Amino acid sequence: MAWQGKLTDRTASIFQGKQMSLKLINIPRVKLSAAAFTKAFCHHKLIEVNATSVDSELLAPDIIHALQSSAWIQKNLQCLVLDSVSIPPNSGLVALSHFTGLHTLSVANVSFCNEDLVSVSQLPNLGSLDISNTLVTNISALLSCKNRLRSLTMHYLKCLAMNSPQVLAVIRQLKCLLHLDISDHQQLRSDLAFYLLQQKDILPNLTSLDISGGTDVTDQAVESFLQHRPAMRFVGLLYTDAGYSDFFTAKQGLKVAGGANMSQISEALSRYRNRSCFVKEALFRLFTETLSLRAVLPVMLKLVAIGMRNHPLDLPVQFTASACALNLTRQELARGMPVRLLAEITDLLFKATKNFPYYQQLQKNCLLSLTSSRILMDVPFDRFDAAKLALRWVCRRESPKLRTMAVSITSILALKLSPEEMGQLQEELIMAIKELLTIIRQKLAENLDDVTFLFTLKALWNLTDECPLACKYFMENEGLATVIRVLETFSISVIQSKVLGLLNNVAEVRELSSKLVTEDVIERIISLLHSSNLEVSFLAAGVLAHLTCDRQHWLSRDLQRTDLLRYLHLAIQNWPSSRCDMSVLVTYRSFKAFSPLLVNFSQPEVQRWALWAIHHVCSKNPRPKDV
């Protein structure tokens, strides 16, 4: 529930009764009040609580006070994670000393001070402690638990007032220590790792050491340290100069978090998922490694998704992750990825564009991800947000290649949106249709029928489908005159069919259809009605069917209307069976446009065209119920 954002004060109330018994609660990033937390969870016999990054409405002292209200929890709580939880000024965490059963305590990224460390060091069962990025200046208090502390994590202790020899003098006495993390932000230039690696007899039982971000860390020094400790199973070397020798790949059973190869990068992304500085570095290494990738790597894509989800407001993480996602989901690679994973990464990309609306490269990466046909056609994601992004890029002129991609994406997404959603895109539609018509006029001036030209016609056709608003903007921007010029300039059937499809959409709008009843337009439609290409003939017939259906257009020229109906009748007679192949029809959104034609019993020619079209769609569409 917490992961999906469904745990709130209201929904948490389902845990207030005694119908269920909770032992573990994992509620990262939730927004709960102190009262709701107390009522929902503190009557349960909890042994593990993870409240990482909960909303500032729920403070660390509130959590501790609530848990302390249960004598059973005070005695039996084994694991408490309060990473990145807010603490009011002048409030300490000394009350943690009441939880005598605690084995594991993590207070990373909180205002945890020396007096708090003194207090928790007295806990009789404490075996694992994480004080990363806290306000601790002196770790000497750890000597109180030197005979029981097995894991110590002190990443980025930026306030530490002890020099490296003084720190090592304390660490040396932690005889039971199996895991030690003294990793640091590289910009701090900490030499603690360098001094540690020189010690021959320190921590002989160590199995895990993290010195990522340390300065002057070399392969030779790390190899020597590990060879003296054969039980070592993990070493963290990201953001250092070590990890590149064959020793690290040859040593059996050793895991390395670093940047030398894909295995090390994967381990780094997994281990450091909550540390943005290391996630960013690991993602940068991953980007470099995947520039020419040919293998499908769903595990890596999942790690990228975790990094994005854990650091939504960190621009370097989001930007680098978006670039990695592109490398991992290029065309054929995307086909091998699970749909749910692709949906997750696509959703995260769109969230990133909303969090950083003015960062162009991030917006561009999100758009580029949609050029994957697998993602665009098969993956469930918010089509509305995608269409909004694509329409905006249609109007950008700094990159013709990207604009062509945006036009192509728009042409596909337009058919995925409901009429209501299209109505919400009014501002984007106005700008995009104007820009699409500008592109067509440019291509006409160049007499160029390239792929951009075809995508643009297709986009206009699909944007105007069952969208009177788009049809209105098309007509207001002299779109009719423009597409008639297209028909005069190009005689290729694929171009003709796209223009006729667009004119069908305009003809379906009663308020606009009368503007198509001009000699120039009618003559052009009649000539295309007799085309040997079935798609062209069919779509030309559709325009005539819609125009002749409304007698109001023909009050002064009923004779011409009669001729058009006769032409329509003869054309349909010459067509093959409605079961014939004609892929253009599968783009119909619904049968709504045929309704006024079917009830027009005074014009059987119009009815016949509508019936032919409906039968064709139903016989060719594998899922006609979706239409």
UniProtKB/Swiss-Prot annotation:
State which gene encodes it: Zyg11a
**What SUPFAM superfamilies would the database entry show?**
ARM repeat, RNI-like
Record's family?
Answer: Belongs to the zyg-11 family.
Question: Looking at the Swiss-Prot or TrEMBL record, what is one Pfam family this protein matches?
Answer: ZER1-like_2nd
Cite the PROSITE patterns for this sequence.
Answer: ARM_REPEAT
> Mind listing the UniProt keywords for this protein, alphabetically?
Leucine-rich repeat, Repeat, Ubl conjugation pathway
Q: Which Gene3D superfamilies match?
A: Leucine-rich Repeat Variant, Ribonuclease Inhibitor
What are the start and end residues of each LRR repeat?
Answer: 123-146, 203-227, 409-432
Please identify the protein, giving its name as recorded. Answer: Protein zyg-11 homolog A
Q: What does this protein do?
A: Probably acts as a target recruitment subunit in an E3 ubiquitin ligase complex ZYGA-CUL2-elongin BC.
